[in-house]
């Protein structure tokens, strides 16, 4: 949500949720601050915190969610082939379910602190690229 709200702030408002509320990893806060994004809320919200809200899109970002586009076996937007599939699933929040696959969860990275921080940078940059591309394709980023 921080990336979307930073780079597409005039056109999109995003909220972020995790399966359970948890502290935000300090390495994520650090790599976001490298590109000018200040993280002020240091806890993720749980999905249940949004139970009464509706959204245009519910987006799952990380590749280990197990969802892929039609070309790769499911019905969703695919970050691997960068295309919107024709049958987006509806969610309980009223929005279309969209998956970006192929982005590894940096919180599961192993190695030195520098290697893990680099995994966060890579995920940050990949997520930014696919979100900007996605919102352009759904006409939210056209002047």
Spans of model-derived segments:
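Conserved active-site segments centered on acidic
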Residues: 1-51
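Short, charged/polar "capping" segments at the starts of alpha-helices
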Residues: 22-25, 65-69
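Conserved acidic residues
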Residues: 56
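Redox-cofactor binding/interface segments in oxidoreductases and associated redox assembly factors
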Residues: 60-61
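Phosphate-binding/catalytic loops
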Residues: 67-143
């Amino acid at each position: 949500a921080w990336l979307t709200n930073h780079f597409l702030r005039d056109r999109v408002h995003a909220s972020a949720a995790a399966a359970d509320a948890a502290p935000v990893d300090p390495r994520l806060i650090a790599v976001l601050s490298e590109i000018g994004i200040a993280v002020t809320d240091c806890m993720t919200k749980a999905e249940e915190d949004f139970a009464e809200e509706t959204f245009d899109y519910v987006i799952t970002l990380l590749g280990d969610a197990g969802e892929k586009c039609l070309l790769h076996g499911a019905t969703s937007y695919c970050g691997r082939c960068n295309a919107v599939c024709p049958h987006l699933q509806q969610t309980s929040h009223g929005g279309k379910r969209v998956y970006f696959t192929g982005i590894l969860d940096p919180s599961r990275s192993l190695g030195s602190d520098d290697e893990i921080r680099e995994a966060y940078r890579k995920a940050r940059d990949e997520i930014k690229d696919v979100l900007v591309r996605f919102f352009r394709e759904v006409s939210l980023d056209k002047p």
